[in-house]
């Protein structure tokens, strides 16, 4: 009985020892695996057991190298930074709490993927702003050039218009000057032609009157200016004299609107009156055609020479 109890107790103790051994082995494996994986949120150098002072010294050396490379990077980015200073300041004001991407610097290989993507996005936005600003400047230059060309063309058109107006004005003045000179010449000629003798001896007057009447009868159609010139009278005096002779029955005829006097003898007037009486009702066209046959407008001298 005692032997069986002792064997049972020994078996139980053995099972307990085996169980404790397996549990201890499992815990050791878990700790080893956890130690092999980097802890999230804890710097890698702290996980590796690097002293904090050594980490600080290494960080200082890294910043010193970045500061030494900063002048070259700034000189390369100076033109774009000078043009885009306002946009960069606004972007810097909006991203005060976030890291900035140094131009030309190589991203740290140990930097997290999220941080790397964020910095690359900022760099892409900066390049896009620079391109937009460059395009804007190009448009401004193009618009300024087009405005200058348009203004130059407008100036040329205005100059052409001004020269044309000046040429028209000079041509008009020259034309008016010539017309005025011709008017003065005609006026002087009329003054000379209209000069005549208003007074004379009685015998001379009668002789001149007879010659005046005979001149009209011989020429049949006389220009009043030529008639006045031939007898050294004024044109109006010649017209007045013809009207006086018509009133007293010495001359018969008509003065047309062209300044001519057409002499018609009494015999010719009688022939026209007889034609109208014979025909009764006569149209103007028929009267004009018959008048050409009934009234002789050929000068006497020309008729005699032809005869």
Swiss-Prot record:
Annotated compartments: Endoplasmic reticulum membrane
Disordered: region residues: 31-175
Gene Ontology molecular function, alphabetical: ubiquitin-like protein ligase binding
SMART domains, alphabetized: DDRGK
Compositional bias segments (type: Low complexity): 52-83
Residue ranges, Lumenal side: 1-2
Pfam families named among the record's database cross-references: DDRGK
Ranges annotated as biased composition (Basic and acidic residues): 107-175
Keyword Hydrolase among record annotations: no
Swiss-Prot/TrEMBL keywords: Endoplasmic reticulum, Membrane, Transmembrane, Transmembrane helix, Ubl conjugation pathway
Superkingdom of origin organism: Eukaryota
Regions crossing the membrane: 3-23
Regions of this protein lying in the Cytoplasmic compartment: 24-307
This protein's GO CC annotations: endoplasmic reticulum membrane
Topology class, membrane: Single-pass membrane protein
Similarity field: Belongs to the DDRGK1 family.
Quaternary structure (record): Interacts with Atg9; the interaction is transient.
Official protein name in the record: DDRGK domain-containing protein 1
Recorded name of the encoding gene: Ddrgk1
């Amino acid at each position: 009985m005692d032997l069986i109890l002792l064997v049972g107790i020994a078996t139980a103790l053995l099972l307990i020892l085996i169980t404790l051994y397996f549990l201890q082995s499992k815990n050791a494996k878990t700790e080893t695996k956890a130690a092999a994986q980097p802890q999230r949120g804890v710097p890698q150098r702290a996980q590796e057991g690097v002293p904090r002072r050594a980490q600080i010294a290494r960080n200082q050396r890294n910043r010193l190298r970045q500061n030494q490379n900063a002048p070259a990077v700034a000189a390369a980015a100076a033109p774009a930074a000078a043009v885009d200073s306002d946009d960069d300041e606004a972007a810097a004001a909006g991203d005060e709490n976030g890291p900035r991407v140094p131009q030309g610097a190589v991203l740290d290989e140990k930097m997290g993927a999220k941080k790397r993507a964020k910095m690359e996005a900022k760099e892409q936005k900066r390049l896009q702003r620079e391109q937009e600003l460059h395009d804007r400047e190009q448009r401004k230059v193009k618009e300024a050039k087009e405005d200058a060309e348009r203004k130059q063309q407008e100036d040329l058109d205005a100059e052409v218009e001004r020269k044309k107006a000046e040429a028209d004005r000079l041509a008009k003045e020259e034309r008016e000057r010539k017309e005025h000179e011709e008017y003065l010449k005609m006026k002087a000629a009329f003054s000379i032609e209209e000069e005549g003798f208003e007074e004379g001896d009685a015998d001379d007057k009668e002789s001149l009157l007879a010659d005046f009447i005979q001149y009209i009868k011989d020429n049949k159609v006389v220009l009043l200016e030529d008639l006045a010139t031939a007898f050294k009278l004024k044109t109006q005096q010649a017209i007045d004299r013809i009207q006086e002779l018509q009133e007293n029955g010495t001359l018969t005829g008509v003065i047309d609107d062209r300044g001519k006097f057409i002499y018609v003898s009494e015999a010719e007037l009688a022939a026209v009156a007889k034609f109208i009486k014979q025909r009764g009702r006569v149209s103007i066209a028929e009267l004009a055609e018959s008048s050409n046959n009934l009234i002789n407008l050929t000068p006497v001298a020309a008729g005699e020479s032809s005869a």
